[in-house]
Amino acid sequence: MNAIQESFTDKLFANYEANVKYQAIENAASHNGIFAALERRQSHVDNTPVFSLDLTKDKVTNQKASGRCWMFAALNTFRHKLISQYKLENFELSQAHTFFWDKYEKSNWFLEQVIATADQELTSRKVKFLLQTPQQDGGQWDMVVSLFEKYGVVPKSVYPESVSSSSSRELNAILNKLLRQDAQILRDLLASGADHATVQDKKEDLLQEIFNFLAMSLGLPPRKFDFAYRDKDDNYQSEKGITPQEFYKKYVNLPLEDYVSVINAPTADKPYGKSYTVEMLGNVVGSRAVRYINVPMERLKELAIAQMQAGETVWFGSDVGQLSNRKAGILATDVYDFESSMDIQLTQDKAGRLDYSESLMTHAMVLTGVDLDENGKAKKVKVTLGNADAENQEILSGLKK
């Protein structure tokens, strides 16, 4: 290994001080911040909030201090349909309801994984992975569909937010503490030679404790409820004693079994046209597996545009923290000028960014509009970002590589 020599550092000083541009950027960046100093004026011109296809102007929902973006995005795709079809105003589906059942199901998923790996040492890679984070807020499209199909959905007015659904840190800390303790109980029971029935009986006792904790923290979910509303024409509508599953089938009524997650992962280990999954990722035991179909980016764009042209908003995920100006509402790879300002060359392609851990999907959102050119190609898309950090605004996404 070669250490940095003082003579080399002297050379770097000399090169920097000889460049007047660097000193100007130093003044701007040190006083205003790096991104503010490098922001491209043209990015605002290229991303004006006008779209040739704009599906919704509904008020944006806010996930607050929780990791429920995937739930919010999925429920917002239904919400647009319901508001349009039933002439509703300021209507939301309950994100807290889906959150409750996700925590319940993830707890069972974790305990079943603990049972399945009980013959492995605590130091094994899989067991360490399980115990590191027994459960957390995040999820995928297939996971939220599994929850909808099993537990249905309810209006937010029926099961509103709680402190622990809007800010989930305390709940997650306590639930993970319980689950790690439960993992030890089940592993010790299996190590003592207990049979399958005894282990499952104990697991059910542990799930009762977890259910009680969730109900006391979030509120007990409704088994049946009354649904009453006034539409935009001020007509009164009501329905008595409907279950969450009945509400889902009657009012949402989408063939979600026909929807799949399509991704663009141009890495050598993931050929296009094939289906992929992630081991030990899920929530509802026995439900649909998390699955992705890998396609070229142009095909992904075509599918998203076609779905919006058919009148449906699109659930999607991206690396939302990369190269964005949230205050301006712009998410685009050319929003900041690193090259001509700082002489920094950001040339790593998407495959390289994925392979070298520079990028991954971090946030789920909804595509709600698109601006097409004369050839039907997307110039920019409209994105609904249900996130408190972005001041609950809609952002724009430039469709560049």
Regions flagged by a language model, labelled:
Residues K377-K382:
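Short aromatic-glycine-enriched beta-strand elements
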